[in-house]
């Protein structure tokens, strides 16, 4: 029997609303009771697109009483990744930015209205951290059945590499399940072998002048860029440092039709017409809908790159939500 009851959701580290969009994409009838983030720009974008649901709050100050008052069946969270990134300081639980997540773990055993479902996302590398070890212990002691694993959008025929750790937890669940079960919910299962290309996500006509990579940047850092073409089937992970960092921050696009990129780069790199992806193109690759709006906000495109770099892949998470909530039979 299909469930007709709407799901009460608490969106922690809500950012620009990636989890909200993922719930919509998964066709889950949900009510976001509260979305919480400490970033005012992220909250501005969230509220512009979803109504005034996002609250500027410090998660490290929330108490068991606060969580009980929310009384939500699903908690979603994407804790700060900086303590665990390969280019970060890797201070793990000693990093002040881990305090909010540690507070959730400290408070959870004292919550009376425990959520039946929890979804956690973080960077690859989190799984080896002390924070992850504590997370597993707390969830197990609270009666959760946790599955976890590393997934990337390119496993779902999305031409973007963004490996992330995902943890899905069901309260008092005795059955067998696996993170690999997620593929039955994806389009990959229905469209075996179909590979999308970068061109499917590109804007068609606009003034590219402000997106072109400067000659001085190419001369100094050009060999560190990952250069892709419109017919490429993958591009690198876009991080919060895109457009002002080079290595590991995201790919750039070759607009010329030169076949041998390396040879042409050495001969005349400017002829390749290399440009940055626009924020809209990055948003598309990350699964956000065209309705995602920021032009009516005070958030600049430069800031939008940072917010997207901190966000989730909406499509991948929508599949994970379908897996997590499968027992509800929506």
Swiss-Prot record:
Cellular localization per UniProt: Cytoplasm; Nucleus
InterPro entries linked to this entry: C5-MTase, C5_MeTfrase, C5_meth_CS, SAM-dependent_MTases_sf
Residue span, SAM-dependent MTase C5-type domain: 7-330
Keywords of this entry: Cytoplasm, Methyltransferase, Nucleus, RNA-binding, S-adenosyl-L-methionine, Transferase, tRNA processing
EC supergroup of this enzyme: transferase
Catalytic reactions of this protein: cytidine(38) in tRNA + S-adenosyl-L-methionine = 5-methylcytidine(38) in tRNA + S-adenosyl-L-homocysteine + H(+)
GO molecular function: tRNA (cytidine) methyltransferase activity; tRNA (cytidine-5-)-methyltransferase activity; tRNA binding
Cited Pfam families: DNA_methylase
Principal location: cytoplasm
Entries under PANTHER family matching the protein: TRNA (CYTOSINE(38)-C(5))-METHYLTRANSFERASE
Family: Belongs to the class I-like SAM-binding methyltransferase superfamily. C5-methyltransferase family.
Protein name: tRNA (cytosine(38)-C(5))-methyltransferase
Gene behind the chain: pmt1
């Amino acid at each position: 029997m299909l469930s007709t009851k709407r799901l009460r959701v608490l969106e922690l580290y809500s950012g620009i609303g990636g989890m909200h969009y993922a719930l919509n994409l998964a066709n889950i009838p949900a009510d976001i009771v509260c979305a919480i983030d400490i970033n005012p720009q992220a909250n501005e974008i969230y509220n512009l697109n979803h109504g005034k649901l996002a609250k500027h709050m410090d998660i490290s100050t929330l108490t068991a009483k606060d969580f009980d008052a929310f009384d939500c069946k699903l908690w979603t969270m994407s804790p700060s990744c900086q303590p665990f990134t390969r280019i970060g300081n890797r201070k793990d639980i000693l990093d002040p930015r881990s305090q909010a997540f540690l507070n959730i773990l400290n408070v959870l055993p004292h919550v009376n209205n425990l959520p039946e479902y929890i979804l956690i996302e973080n960077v690859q590398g989190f799984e080896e951290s002390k924070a992850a070890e504590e997370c597993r212990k707390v969830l197990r002691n609270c009666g959760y059945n946790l599955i976890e694993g590393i997934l990337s959008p390119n496993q779902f025929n999305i031409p973007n590499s963004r490996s992330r750790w995902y943890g899905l937890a069901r309260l008092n669940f005795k059955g067998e399940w696996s993170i690999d079960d997620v593929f039955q919910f994806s389009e990959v299962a229905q469209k075996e072998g179909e590979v999308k290309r970068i061109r499917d996500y590109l804007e068609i006509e606009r003034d590219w002048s402000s997106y072109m990579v400067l000659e001085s940047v190419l001369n100094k850092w050009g060999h560190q860029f990952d250069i892709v073409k419109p017919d490429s089937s993958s591009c690198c992970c876009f991080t919060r440092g895109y457009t002002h960092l080079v290595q590991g921050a995201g790919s750039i696009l070759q607009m010329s039709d030169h076949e041998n990129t390396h040879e042409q780069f050495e001969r005349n790199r400017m002829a390749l017409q290399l440009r940055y992806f626009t924020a809209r193109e990055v948003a598309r690759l990350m699964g956000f809908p065209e309705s995602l709006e920021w032009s009516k906000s005070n958030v600049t495109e430069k800031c939008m790159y940072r917010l997207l770099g901190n966000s989730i892949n909406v499509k991948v998470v929508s599949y994970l939500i379908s897996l997590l909530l499968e027992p509800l039979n929506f």
